[in-house]
UniProtKB/Swiss-Prot annotation:
This is Octanoyltransferase. The gene is lipB. InterPro entries: aa-tRNA-synth_II/BPL/LPL (IPR045864), BPL_LPL_catalytic (IPR004143), Octanoyltransferase (IPR000544), Octanoyltransferase_CS (IPR020605). It catalyses: octanoyl-[ACP] + L-lysyl-[protein] = N(6)-octanoyl-L-lysyl-[protein] + holo-[ACP] + H(+). The lineage of its organism: Bacteria, Pseudomonadati, Bacteroidota, Flavobacteriia, Flavobacteriales. In the reaction, the free carboxyl group of octanoic acid is attached via an amide linkage to the epsilon-amino group of a specific lysine residue of lipoyl domains of lipoate-dependent enzymes. It holds the Pfam family LplA-B_cat. One of its GO terms (cellular component) is cytoplasm. Catalyzes the transfer of endogenously produced octanoic acid from octanoyl-acyl-carrier-protein onto the lipoyl domains of lipoate-dependent enzymes. Lipoyl-ACP can also act as a substrate although octanoyl-ACP is likely to be the physiological substrate. GO terms for molecular function: lipoyl(octanoyl) transferase activity. The record marks 157 as: Lowers pKa of active site Cys.
């Protein structure tokens, strides 16, 4: 079992080329697993964690409802935002500057074969990261992701999640709002959930800007511990 996760920080990169890159890495792992099984080999499979910041883009999961996008094509263009219907779980979400997007592309057979546990550990890494900033966050029953003010009328989402898995290989991942322009969420019903707000780390801390590299290092620390991995 290979518990090393290769970290790649892609910086600012458009959604489409990043999605294609994810698919390449994902398919390479799947292909090697098929080869291992067919030829009775035991070649180690790779694991990756991609960090990226996307230009303005809305993405809709495979079970999502297009009605949760409140803009037409011309309005999207006017906002300089792209739109993609993609192959992850979940509904609609927004990605943009000031948001830390993480795509773990893992062979879960290197760790554990349990998608539910995988999602809960991704959430836990965010909960622990936010706790380091003095914020109490948690899960909202039946709604994947991480929230503040759970169980109150002021529940607000700070981290969205949506993944795809096949043959125990994962792709897509999480999006943590750090210094993001929350106005872009007004153009969607985030994750198809009505009546709940969206927030970001800088808003919750009452500061203009949070150091995103510092946040990433905390996420890496917690993922390393939770997955008993080595992130290199």
């Amino acid at each position: 079992m290979n518990k090393k996760i290769q970290l790649q920080d892609l910086g600012n990169r458009d959604y489409k080329s990043t999605w294609e890159y994810q698919e390449e890495l994902f398919q390479d792992i799947v292909d090697l697993k098929i080869k291992n099984r067919r030829e009775e080999l035991d070649l180690p499979t790779s694991n990756y964690l991609l960090f990226v910041e996307h230009p303005h883009v809305y993405t809709l999961g495979k079970s999502g409802d297009l009605e949760n996008l409140l803009l037409n094509e011309k309005q999207l263009e006017a906002k300089g935002a792209a739109f993609y219907k993609i192959n992850r779980g979940g509904d609609i979400t927004y990605h943009g500057p000031g948001q830390i997007v993480g795509y773990p592309i893992l062979d879960l057979e290197n760790f554990f074969t349990d998608i539910h546990k995988y999602l809960r550990l991704l959430e836990e890494s965010m909960i622990l990261t936010l706790a380091e900033y003095g914020l109490e966050s948690g899960r909202s029953e039946g709604e994947t992701g991480v929230w503040l003010g759970v169980g109150t009328p002021f529940a607000r989402k700070i981290c969205a999640m949506g993944v795809r898995a096949s043959r125990w290989v994962t792709m897509h991942g999480f999006a943590l709002n750090v210094n993001v322009d929350l106005g872009y969420f007004d153009n969607i019903i985030p994750c198809g959930i009505r009546g709940k707000g969206v927030t970001s780390l800088n808003v919750e801390l009452g500061v203009e800007k949070v150091d995103e590299d510092e946040v990433k290092s905390k996420i890496i620390k917690h993922l390393t511990h939770l997955f008993e991995a080595e992130i290199v």
